[in-house]
From Swiss-Prot:
The gene is RASGRF1. It comes from Homo sapiens. Residues 240-426 form the DH domain. The modification Phosphoserine is found at residues 577, 626, 758, 779, 800. Transmembrane segments: none annotated. This is Ras-specific guanine nucleotide-releasing factor 1. CDD domains: PH_RasGRF1_2, RasGEF, REM, RhoGEF. Residues 22-129, 467-584 form the PH domain. PROSITE patterns: DH_1, DH_2, IQ, PH_DOMAIN, RASGEF, RASGEF_CAT, RASGEF_NTER.
Length: 1273
């Protein structure tokens, strides 16, 4: 009997451990058992040609060993599945290992992954020792061959060295021989007689020619070497690096000058003023406004001197040590940054002092300031660190990786980027204050309401104001006329609380019009103003529904009405939607603030403030902490938005979508920023799906923390005095209304401070109005409500005249007055209600009899004509539902009077007309008025209110989206179809209110119809007309024609840029033509026009013709300046500064002094100095239409993008950055949306678009050298 082979068990175990650690292939495989019935999963490890398997990957001792030498490994086909097989064969991949021994059974293995199977087969196939030995042998043969080659080369090298040594010896011998020959030659020449003179002169000439040739050859060789280096990449990189440093020196000199003006013109004089007998400002305020300003000036003076010293040692420029000096002082900048917002707030507060404001204007009028304001100088340090980051980026781009300064510059950039992120947040948060102060400075009369730092700027633009008496006389043709444009054009500025209406005066300054400061809290917006039959006949279709009306009821002056006309339907929709949203924000703030103060002792917006005195802990515990407390997925800034809620600094996409659909408030500034920037962090479909979810499942879709806040609206069970206040002691005069009137509830204890809370009461059914104060709170609530409602089928109700008793109206602590007890008989209330109804009907009839009267009392509202009922409107505010017309109206709430409870107000605001609604549903909607109903009934009312609010929110967001961002739907058919489908589904909802259905229909109409207001020719049509047509020469067109058509072309190119291209710096990326095609087209158009102007000047051979061309183009530039086409001004001035034109000294000597002075004026206007400060001032002082220089905005966007990523390290969206970019886009779109009224002239545009004679840069310079050659030096 043959004995088994003995193996060293310990050695095998150690090899197994080595395989576990360093094996070439490891993992789980399924192995077929010896009886071919089962598959066992083992952990295999391959080490060279040894295959170990273990019970698991944690086993320390191998279960078996296979010697793979001489084996063959191949993939095996999958076997036919058995009927009882449970595992799917498509996830099993087989391979076999066949051994060379005939009686040895093949090893069958399988894996679940095809890739894993192939890798195992390849690893086993290469595990043979024989293969390794063969490869080793081949390598040894190659090694021996290379050794032979090396030996041969060594022999050859030795021979060459020997030849070189022999050559050197021969050279030395020849040198000695030459020396001896020269000595012999000198000796012979000294003994010989002197040669004839003519022979000497010939030799001298030959020598001179030889010397000249030698010098010429040397100079030519040297010139070639220099030119080769100049054209080399290294020299180009060094030139660019030096250019960056020189630009940095100029920028630093300008910045030091700005700091010098800030300190010497403002800080030091104000310190002296604070020490006077009657100081206009205190030393503490001076320190708060100018914190660290003087220290920063000293720091940069040192930095600037060091930079100048480095420049003096050019071309060796070492800059890293300069930044090493700057970096330790960054804490000074950090203190300045953190104080920046507080600084501007203190400045705004101090400007309310007339003496200080007068003194400050005196300082700002100094020539050094160049009409720049103090807040502008205070903002300059905020932009310096981003400028350093851009400079370091450019320096690093042109600094080799092995450069000694590379690491130091990288470190400086990283440190500055950390500070830059903080600065961007601070600049974003203070931008609103700076914008308000800038507008206030533009108004000659001043505007104190803009010094309120809580005001949020929303939009600005040009509108035409139409007097009421001329409403029917204005026609579309006259709207475009110069006479009405002069008389009626207004510059309108919308803020979160006010609308400012101004006229433009000389020098770009603004003048407030009469009643030009409109408080939105007193406003009623009517989008489709009513018109009588005579007015309709007079106006016809000319005005084309571009006008809207704002009714204003100030508390201390007579009411008045403002009619404004937009230039297009899109502009009108943007204005009305923003005004409506601002009014809704004020109304929501007022209602909720009053409700929370009376209901839960928590005040909105104080419920989200962390500094409220006395009730801080109670507020934080009882309100929604997610509105002000930072969390892992959201972080807040210090400033508040228009809804008095902390602005979001960073947030996740989900939290941003939550804020968009938060039913408690919707800030207009958040909404505009979100709609501008959502493409950066999400898609339109995701946003739409979120809105659809909120509409379909409002209760389950909103977070639980919202419900806790919303439930405070329904906590009226213990404070019914809010609903049933004391009766007024004197009845108020009634007013006539053809639509439902405002609900006025007043407190009679302080009649001198009485204000009205106007809410539009919805029509429940058949024109009946509901008065919540007339409803009973007992168990027979339905009966009493029905009896109270029945008389009002044709009448409307003013609750300020009602005297309602209730068992729940107790003594109000802060007034001390008592109310009568409620009658026990339920019929008493019905009787009382009927008496009230009769009084109301008599009053209404009396008012209807004097229909032509006009009410002008400060306590009364403007009459709403009957014709309003038949108007359709796209307006859909949060709390306003009238039958047939939508009006936004609100009043400031007074803390000293009783007010409507939040539950009642919310019910009134969200109920509406719905014909055919069952009585039970009507009563259920009104049950919020009674705290005596069961809890399940109140829960049902709460759900109804939330559903109405959710529907309102969805339609409101869609309205803003469709009216302001129509291009989203023009370029995305899927989104457009999905929105239309959703709105059609909404319209078929049987529970939808009439006004909600109208709002949905208006959005669909806006999506499907084209705006007929813009009939301007398109750029494509102009380009198509210019193709294949020979253009007339430059001399055939006047300067005015060229300027007008150039302005038309520039604006058509500029207005085509979609705002999504301004995100992400796509114009600086490699794929810029794909990411930002319209920005690149604008850049190409700018360069084409500049090349055209330069080519037109250069191609004139005659010097007088060139002078004439220059003067004509300068005249074109000046006309473009008058047309506010600053892009064309820069196109023309940049072409004049090109080297091919600038070097024409003879030509420029013949150009007149007036033309040269005009060129200097235009160049100063569009100069990039001070971040285009002169151009920005010109844009601020001009009215659209206008074509700004796009590069200015791209520079601003680059400053924002550099060092501030779109996402934080935690993956949160940088919403502060989105807000800053959105504000820049808002300004760009203001200029894009206002078109020029210039008639197209095909012959001129054909010349401007003709590229047949345009030369490139090199050809231009060659032609310039040909017409005026270089003068010899």
């Amino acid at each position: 009997m043959q004995k088994g082979i003995r193996l060293n068990d310990g050695h095998v175990a150690s090899l197994g451990l080595l395989a576990r650690k360093d094996g070439t292939r490891k993992g789980y495989l399924s192995k077929r058992s010896s009886d071919n019935t089962k598959w066992q999963t083992k952990w295999f490890a391959l080490l060279q040609n040894l295959l170990f398997y273990f019970e698991s990957d944690s086993s320390s001792r191998p279960s078996g060993l296979y010697l793979l030498e001489g084996c063959v490994c191949d993939r095996a086909p999958s076997p036919k599945p058995a009927l009882s097989a449970k595992e799917p064969l498509e996830k099993q991949h087989y391979f076999t290992v066949n051994f060379s021994h005939e009686n040895q059974k093949a090893l069958e293995l399988r894996t679940e992954d095809a890739k894993d199977c192939d890798e195992w087969v390849a690893a086993i196939a290469h595990a043979s020792y024989r293969t390794l030995a063969t490869e080793h042998e081949a390598l040894m043969q190659k090694y021996l061959h290379l050794l032979q080659i090396v030996e041969t080369e060594k022999t050859v090298a030795k021979q060459l060295r020997q030849q070189i040594e022999d050559g050197e010896i021969e050279i030395e011998r020849l040198k000695a021989e030459i020396t001896s020959l020269l000595k012999d030659n000198e000796r012979i020449q000294s003994t010989q007689t002197v040669a004839p003179n003519d022979e000497d002169s010939d030799i001298k000439k030959i020598k001179k020619v030889q010397s000249f040739l030698r010098g010429w050859l040397c100079r030519r060789k040297w010139k070639t070497i220099i030119q080769d280096y100049i054209r080399s990449p290294h020299a180009d990189s060094m030139r660019k690096r030096n250019q960056v440093v020189f630009s940095m020196l100029e920028a630093e000199a300008e910045y030091v000058q700005q700091l010098h003006i800030l300190v010497n013109n403002f800080l030091r004089p104000l310190r002296m003023a604070a020490s006077s007998k009657k100081p206009p400002i205190t030393h503490d305020d001076v320190s708060s406004i100018f914190l660290n300003s003087e220290t920063i000036m000293f720091l940069h003076q040192i930095f600037y001197q060091g930079l100048k010293a480095r420049i003096s040692s050019w071309p060796t420029l070492v800059l890293a040590d300069l930044f090493d000096i700057l970096l330790p002082m960054l804490n000074i900048y950090q203190e300045f940054v953190r104080n920046h917002q507080y600084s501007l707030q203190i400045l705004a507060h101090c400007k309310q002092n007339r003496d200080f404001d007068k003194l400050l204007k005196h300082y700002e009028a100094k020539p050094d300031c160049e009409e720049r304001t103090l807040e502008t100088f205070l903002t300059y340090p905020m932009f310096q660190i981003p400028r350093y980051i851009l400079t370091l980026h450019e320096l690093l781009a042109h600094t080799p990786h092995e450069h000694v300064e590379r690491n130091s510059l990288d470190y400086a950039k990283s440190k500055l980027e950390e500070l830059s992120r903080i600065m961007h947040d601070e600049v974003s948060e203070t931008e609103n204050i700076r914008k308000n102060l800038a507008i206030e400075r533009m108004i000659i009369e001043g505007c104190e309401i803009l010094l309120d730092t809580s005001q949020t700027f929303v939009r600005q633009g040009s509108l035409i104001q139409v007097p009421m008496s001329e409403k029917g006389k204005i026609t579309r043709g006259r709207l475009g006329s110069l006479s009405l444009k002069k008389e009626g054009e207004r510059q309108c500025f919308l803020f979160s609380k006010h609308l400012i209406i101004c006229t433009r005066g000389s020098g770009g300054k603004l003048h407030l019009t009469k009643n030009g400061v409109i408080s939105l809290i007193d406003c009623t917006l009517l989008e489709e103003p009513e018109s009588t039959e005579e007015e309709a006949k007079g106006s016809g279709q000319d005005i084309d529904h571009l006008d809207f009306k704002i009714g204003v009821e100030p508390k201390d002056s007579p009411p008045f009405t403002v009619i404004l006309v937009a230039s297009s339907r899109q502009e009108k929709a943007a204005w009305t939607s923003d005004i409506s949203q601002c009014v809704d924000n004020i109304r929501c703030n007022g209602l909720m603030m009053n409700a929370f103060e009376e209901n839960s002792k928590v005040t909105v917006p104080q419920m989200i403030k962390r500094t409220r005195e006395g009730t801080r802990e109670a507020e934080m515990s009882r309100s929604d902490a997610s509105l002000y407390c930072d969390d892992v997925d959201i972080r807040f800034s210090k400033t508040m938005n228009s809804c008095k809620v902390l602005q979001i600094r960073y947030a996740s996409v989900e939290r941003l979508l939550e804020r968009l659909t938060d039913l408690r408030f919707l800030s207009i500034d958040f909404l505009n920023t979100f709609l501008h920037s959502y493409r950066v962090f999400t898609t339109a479909i995701v946003v739409l799906d979120k809105l659809i979810t909120i509409y379909k499942k409002p209760i389950s879709a909103i977070p639980a923390r919202w419900l806790r806040s919303l439930e405070l609206l329904f906590a009226s069970g213990q404070n019914n005095k809010l609903l049933y206040g004391e009766p007024p002691k004197s009845p108020r005069a009634t007013r006539k209304f053809s639509s439902p009137p405002p609900l006025s509830i007043t407190k009679t204890s302080s009649p001198s401070r009485r204000r009205k809370l106007s809410l539009n009461i919805p029509i429940i059914t058949g024109g009946k109005a509901l008065d919540l104060a007339a409803l009973s709170c007992n168990s027979n609530g339905y009966t009493s409500m029905y009896s109270a409602m029945s008389p009002f089928s044709k009448a409307t109700l003013d609750t300020s005249k009602l005297y309602v008793s209730s068992s729940f109206t107790n003594k109000i602590p802060d007034e001390g007055d008592t109310t009568p007890e409620k009658p026990e008989d339920p019929s008493a209330l019905s009787k009382q209600s009927s008496e009230v109804s009769m009084r109301e009907e008599s009053d209404i009839d009396q008012n209807q009899s004097d229909d032509g009267d006009t009410e002008t009392s400060p306590t009364k509202s403007p009459t709403t004509p009957k014709s309003v009922k038949n108007k359709n409107s796209s307006e859909f505010p949060l709390f306003s539902y009238n039958n047939g017309v939508v009006m936004t109206s609100c009043r400031e709430l007074d803390n000293n009077r009783s007010a409507l409870s939040a539950a009642s107000a919310f019910a009134i605001a969200t109920a509406g007309a719905n014909e055919g609604t069952p009585n039970k549903e009507k009563y259920r909607r009104m049950s919020l008025a009674s705290a005596g109903f069961p809890p399940d009934q109140r829960n049902g009312d709460k759900e109804f209110v939330i559903r109405r609010a959710a529907t309102n929110r969805v339609l409101n967001v869609l309205r803003h989206w469709v009216s302001k961002h129509s291009q989203d739907f023009e370029t995305n058919d899927e989104l457009k179809c999905k929105v239309i489908g959703f709105l059609e589904e909404v319209m078929h909802d049987p529970e939808l209110l009439t006004q909600e259905r109208k709002a949905a229909a208006n959005i669909i109409r806006t999506l499907t119809q084209e705006d007929p207001g813009d009939n301007q020719i398109t750029l494509e049509e102009i380009t198509q007309m210019a193709e294949g047509v020979k253009a007339e020469p430059f001399e055939n067109h006047s300067a005015l024609e060229i300027a007008e058509q150039l302005t038309l072309l520039d604006h058509l190119v500029f207005k085509k840029i979609p705002y999504e291209e301004f995100f992400g710096q796509g114009w600086m990326k490699l794929e810029k033509n794909e990411r930002t095609p319209y920005i690149m087209k604008t850049t190409k158009h700018f360069n084409d026009i500049s090349n055209l102007i330069a080519s037109e000047i250069i191609r004139n051979e005659d010097i007088n013709a060139r002078v004439s061309a220059i003067e004509k183009w300068v005249a074109v530039a000046d006309i473009c300046r008058c047309l506010h086409n600053y892009n064309a001004v820069l196109e023309i001035t940049s072409s004049m500064n090109r080297s091919a034109i600038f070097r024409l000294k003879k030509t420029w000597l013949k150009v007149s002094k007036q033309t040269k002075a005009l060129i200097d004026k235009l160049q100063k206007l569009v100069s990039s100095e001070g971040r285009f400060k002169n151009l920005r001032e010109a844009l601020k002082n001009c009215d659209p239409p206008c074509v700004p220089y796009l590069g200015m905005y791209l520079t601003d966007l680059a400053f924002i993008e550099e060092g501030t990523p779109n996402y934080t390290e935690d993956g949160l969206v940088n919403f502060s950055k989105m807000r800053m970019i959105s504000h820049i886009i808002r300004e760009i779109r203001q200029f894009q949306q206002t078109a020029y009224k210039i008639e197209h002239q095909a012959k001129v545009t054909q010349y401007l678009l003709d590229q047949s004679f345009v030369m490139d840069e090199e050809s231009l310079y060659e032609s310039s050298l040909r017409i005026e050659p270089k003068l010899p030096t």
